[in-house]
Amino acid sequence: AARHSDDPAKLKKYMKNIQVCGQNLLMLLNNVLDLARIENDKTEMEYSVSDIEKDFRNCLAMFRNQADSKGQTLTVTTQLLHPYIYADVPHLTEVCTNLVSNAVKYTGAGGTIRCGVTQKPGEKEGWCDTVVTVADNGIGMSQEFQQHIFEPFERERTSTVSKVEGSGIGMGIVKKL
């Protein structure tokens, strides 16, 4: 970045890249630590009231620029019985982040990613079951790999997938949480 200090546009671009790389590194480190805590039964749940639609949209906002830069369409739908739920918001956000991150990573230019939150009545009166979905028209995965997707550090090894950066930690965390 120092070499381009005379070009504000390039400097801004490089600084943004540095920021994104730093955020990605922090996310990777946090994922490794979370996985270690989960596997050692040291995960603590932090339940609080969540405005589920707002929290979900905030999570998706982290990926909006990345999706836009790839020409991807990122849509959100909600069908809620109760706008507020009692949930472990940090871990729910982590699950959503990992799912959407993978969808954006593995969906090509011009692809579509559909995210949704739906609720159905729960077993107890006044309660509901909340379902988060993330669907895309990305490159997909082989039938063989589908059996291993939730194993920590597992990544499909094909020429198409190998071009995509990732640690293979995210889906292991999703499964365990």
Indicate residue ranges for each PLM-predicted region:
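Short beta-strand/loop element within the Bergerat-fold HATPase_c
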Residues: G110-G126
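Short helix-loop "hinge" at the ATP-lid/N-box region of the Bergerat-fold HATPase_c
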Residues: A103-V104
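Helix-loop junction within the histidine kinase core
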Residues: A36-Y47
